[in-house]
Amino acid sequence: MIPPKYQPIWDKAKEKLKQGRPDDLTHAEKVMKTILEYKGNLPIDQDILIPVAIMHDIGHCMILPEYFKYISGGGKLKNGKLAHMLIGAKIAKDILQEVGYDEEKSKEIIEIIALHDADQLEEKRPEFYNTENKRIFHDFDCLDRYNKERIDAYLKAGLFKTKEEMLKILTEKVDDLFIEEIKTQVKKQLKEL
């Protein structure tokens, strides 16, 4: 499933992802698969977006599980996601250097990871999502939230009190998506939930 050129990144990231939130590893796999299988008209730069998909939530491995409720779910604090983004950027930088990944591409990968959930920082949102790769990744990352497995994982982990609470929040977030094609897909998935 993983193209060989990204396998060293995956191998180094996998154990750290397992130490994060309960579904971080599965989420990384799903976002990566969505990017690899995408057949639409968006310009997909796999050399940037696949490493980002693998490592974007890797910073959760440094957050104690009892504090996940402050970064995900109904009890999420405003700007609560900032810690995992900045920690994740450092971990990603180390992994990319260890595997000898292209330096220029690494810079962009690290920058996307450092602010991939910047929609939590609402006043800075336009400034943070200033490249096509950032906007594309944001929407592909969000796309995985709109499925039964992810909702069940969040409910099981206690990140939301009820399915209705989670669906309400997800419905409100549709307008945060940048790409009409993804918005349409998300709206369809919401109707099926």
What are these regions (language model features)?
Residues P4-K5, K18-D47, M55, P65-E66, ...:
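Divalent metal-dependent phosphate-bond-processing catalytic cores, especially two-metal-ion Mg2+/Mn2+ enzymes
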Residues L17-K30, G74-I87:
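Active-site metal-coordination segments of metallo-dependent hydrolases
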Residues I48-V52, I112:
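Active-site alpha-helix of zinc metalloproteases
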Residues D57, C61:
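Catalytic glutamate of the conserved HExxH
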Residues I110-A118:
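Acidic helix/loop microenvironments that form the catalytic cleft of cell-wall polysaccharide enzymes
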